[in-house]
Amino acid sequence: MILVVGATGSLGRKITAELLTRGEEVRVLVRPGSAAAPISSTAVATGDLLDRDSLERACAGVRAVVTTASVSKTGTDTIENVDLAGNQNLIAAARRAGVEHLVFTSTLSASEHSPVPLFRVKAVVERILRESEMAHTILQPNAFMDVWFPMLIESAAFSGQPVTLVGQSTRRHAFIAERDLAAFAAAAVFTPAARNSTLVLGGPDAVTLRDVVAAYERAGGKPIPIRSVAPGEPIPGVPQPVWGLAASLEMFDSPVPMDENRNTYGVKLTSIDDFARARVAATAA
């Protein structure tokens, strides 16, 4: 039995589906009164990351835990009570229950010195997990295609508007598809090499956002105009809190060598063209 925490979220659902495809029994942790329904054919454990007793019940009889739990964009949760205290509680409950392996979803940007609170807390939880003496795998994915491309490209392009990019948009990033991260998370449960390791994960290529726009042009068969703004200026259709994050992508490159991980875990990586074609086709359907 494998417990998935965060299973009603986008990434968690994909991980659950991957595990079920492999023929595994899956239990999912669902908050009391949650409106989000988990995938059918899973066992449901009702509980909360701040309820230690419920976590111990959820971990009973489980050999591995995969967690994607993180503070949501809505509601009253905070980084401190979900990402920090909640994950601490989960690690402690898994240890007490004799869980053999815990897979934790962090981020490539995790650092205890980061100016971003979430990235600082992710790094703290990584340290707690390493010091716990539990067998573990830490996943450090790069930025998600599924988050950034719809927000920065599709919101404008699919409505016939110019895509607004920050600066020259020449920095290169190995964006990763959620489905690929889900495949790595599931594979880590069964791969001995994953134990007590940190997997830095990205897509097959480091690309610029201009490259991404070009991929959508190829997928849709028509040009997409681009306009540029200075860092900090408004980006039409994009929430204001994201403007600074979008600008930060123009401050560094984040290539991720993937040959070794791709071969070790048997994951076929999604290219920007693969992703754009699927998104354009879904919109046209």
For each feature predicted by the language model, list its residue ranges.
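Short, conserved SAM-binding segment of the class I
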Residues: 86-89, 93
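N-terminal Rossmann-like NAD(P) cofactor-binding module of classical short-chain dehydrogenase/reductase
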Residues: 59, 63-66, 83, 103
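Short glycine/proline- and acidic residue-enriched helix-loop micro-motifs
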Residues: 70-74, 259-262
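Conserved active-site and cofactor/substrate-binding residues in soluble primary-metabolism enzymes
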Residues: 85, 176, 207, 267-270
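A hydrophobic C-terminal alpha-helical subdomain
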Residues: 219-220, 231-285
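Glycine-rich, N-terminal phosphate-binding loop of Rossmann-like dinucleotide-binding domains
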Residues: 68-69, 106
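Glycine-rich NAD(P)-binding loop of the Rossmann-fold in SDR/ketoreductase-type enzymes
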Residues: 50, 81-86
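Oxidoreductase cofactor-interface core, primarily capturing Rossmann-like NAD(P)-dependent enzymes
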Residues: 1-39, 45-46, 50-53, 57-60, ...
